[in-house]
Amino acid sequence: MPHAPAKRQKREEYKNALHEDESNAALPKKKFYRQRAHANPFSDHSLTYPKSPADMDWASLYPAYAVVKREQKSAGEEESTPLDEEEQRRLKAITKNVEIADIGCGFGGLLFALAPKFPDTLMLEYVQEKVRALRLQNASIQLYQNASCLRANTMKFLPNFFSKAQLSKIFLCFPDPHFKQRKHKARIVSYTLNSEYAYVLRPGGVVYTITDVKDLHEWMVGHFEKHPSFERCEKEFEEEGEAMDEGVGIMRTETEEGKKVSRNGGMKYVACFRRVEDPEWP
């Protein structure tokens, strides 16, 4: 009597079926995806990174915003005609820059809630298949064309993707607390990393943080407040009420981890930090 297919085989069969039927607009099922809550930032994962933001293939993530529509070229043309570096960059380019980054996006709940609220803003965050499905479901109104995701090590390669002062918002939602002191170096907030966030964030842009771990909250607040490029946002900006920022409201309620904390009656600690103008050179 044959054995039942292994979980891995079931996952592969499910994913292959999705890829074969490009018109299938059903949302992907989480049970067929291995989603680790956290990844080791010090491991050398088999990932490809652009040499610089100019070499990043944004057109494949946001085809609706591509400078050159790839379907206009046949595969034969691309293979028979070698492209110079400038032409290759044009094929990868999009008509506007990504402005919102959710670092550590989980299942993408935050980004999918933000996308309709900021329809003209490109955002980056199991999720890529969900992006494809939502685009198909909303093809008539072109919704979710502004949302996408990629897997990358932010702690090592953030400036490879984003140029100076490109982003307007960075979200750090329920990051790994790394409780042990010897693991604190792996936390997504540190004085060194804050300098990288300051580099890619435009003056007036905001870093949003939320966690259910008070110790981590105090750590993030302490490190951002010590950094000369950031200042704490007003309490009204962070706290629930009429003056609360729209991004804070979505961050509190729309992430999967945030929903779980609400179900369990846990605390949510929010802190937001605004990028200040750089001082003039003497």
From Swiss-Prot:
<keyword id="KW-0694">RNA-binding</keyword>
<keyword id="KW-0949">S-adenosyl-L-methionine</keyword>
<keyword id="KW-0808">Transferase</keyword>
<keyword id="KW-0539">Nucleus</keyword>
<dbReference type="InterPro" id="IPR029063">
    <property type="entry name" value="SAM-dependent_MTases_sf"/>
</dbReference>
<feature type="region of interest" description="Disordered">
    <location>
        <begin position="1"/>
        <end position="29"/>
    </location>
</feature>
<keyword id="KW-0820">tRNA-binding</keyword>
<dbReference type="Pfam" id="PF02390">
    <property type="entry name" value="Methyltransf_4"/>
</dbReference>
<dbReference type="GO" id="GO:0036265">
    <property type="term" value="P:RNA (guanine-N7)-methylation"/>
</dbReference>
<comment type="function">
    <text>Catalyzes the formation of N(7)-methylguanine at position 46 (m7G46) in tRNA.</text>
</comment>
<comment type="similarity">
    <text>Belongs to the class I-like SAM-binding methyltransferase superfamily. TrmB family.</text>
</comment>
<feature type="active site">
    <location>
        <position position="176"/>
    </location>
</feature>
<feature type="binding site">
    <location>
        <begin position="153"/>
        <end position="154"/>
    </location>
    <ligand>
        <name>S-adenosyl-L-methionine</name>
    </ligand>
</feature>
<dbReference type="InterPro" id="IPR025763">
    <property type="entry name" value="Trm8_euk"/>
</dbReference>
<keyword id="KW-0819">tRNA processing</keyword>
<dbReference type="GO" id="GO:0030488">
    <property type="term" value="P:tRNA methylation"/>
</dbReference>
<dbReference type="GO" id="GO:0000049">
    <property type="term" value="F:tRNA binding"/>
</dbReference>
<dbReference type="GO" id="GO:0043527">
    <property type="term" value="C:tRNA methyltransferase complex"/>
</dbReference>
<keyword id="KW-0489">Methyltransferase</keyword>
<dbReference type="GO" id="GO:0005634">
    <property type="term" value="C:nucleus"/>
</dbReference>
<comment type="pathway">
    <text>tRNA modification; N(7)-methylguanine-tRNA biosynthesis.</text>
</comment>
<feature type="binding site">
    <location>
        <position position="104"/>
    </location>
    <ligand>
        <name>S-adenosyl-L-methionine</name>
    </ligand>
</feature>
<dbReference type="InterPro" id="IPR003358">
    <property type="entry name" value="tRNA_(Gua-N-7)_MeTrfase_Trmb"/>
</dbReference>
<protein>
    <recommendedName>
        <fullName>tRNA (guanine-N(7)-)-methyltransferase</fullName>
        <ecNumber>2.1.1.33</ecNumber>
    </recommendedName>
</protein>
<feature type="binding site">
    <location>
        <begin position="255"/>
        <end position="257"/>
    </location>
    <ligand>
        <name>S-adenosyl-L-methionine</name>
    </ligand>
</feature>
<feature type="compositionally biased region" description="Basic and acidic residues">
    <location>
        <begin position="10"/>
        <end position="22"/>
    </location>
</feature>
<dbReference type="GO" id="GO:0008176">
    <property type="term" value="F:tRNA (guanine(46)-N7)-methyltransferase activity"/>
</dbReference>
<comment type="subunit">
    <text>Forms a complex with TRM82.</text>
</comment>
<feature type="binding site">
    <location>
        <position position="173"/>
    </location>
    <ligand>
        <name>S-adenosyl-L-methionine</name>
    </ligand>
</feature>
